């Protein structure tokens, strides 16, 4: 999800961001960088991660509960929702340690259970199974 790769930029306005600065930044991102821009306020996760993190954690919880296998969770999302990859493969790509870090930050700010990292994720990170970057996560690389 680095900015150079994705077509989206989240334009975050703080309490002190002027309308002129936000408008100039949006114009630059759109016209010069060719990005689609969404505006949001300054909160953990902005828009994308506020939606993405609970989704990824829900997939981990499904596997942890024995509801479905890793492969079946990912297959269901790819085939059933037309996503380019499943949530567990995406978690491996992001890095399970990174996912945990983001989830912890969001949970600390909002205290909402949907942001709480599941025990399986904690155990995998503690074991060094961080996903693609370590060669092992939900999948072997």
Language-model-derived ranges and their functions:
Residues 43-47:
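Conserved short loop/turn motifs at secondary-structure junctions
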């Amino acid at each position: 999800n680095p900015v150079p790769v994705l077509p989206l930029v989240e334009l975050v306005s703080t309490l002190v961001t002027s309308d002129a600065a936000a408008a100039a930044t949006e114009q630059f991102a759109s016209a010069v960088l060719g990005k689609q821009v969404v505006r949001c306020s300054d909160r953990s996760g902005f828009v994308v991660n506020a939606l993405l993190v609970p989704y990824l954690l829900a997939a981990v919880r499904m596997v942890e509960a024995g509801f479905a296998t890793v492969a079946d969770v990912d297959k269901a999302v790819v085939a059933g929702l037309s996503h380019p990859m499943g949530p567990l493969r995406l978690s491996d790509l992001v890095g399970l340690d990174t996912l945990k870090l983001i989830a912890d930050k969001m949970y600390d700010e909002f205290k909402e259970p949907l942001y709480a990292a599941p025990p399986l994720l904690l155990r995998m990170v503690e074991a060094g199974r961080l996903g693609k970057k370590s060669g092992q996560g939900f999948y072997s690389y």
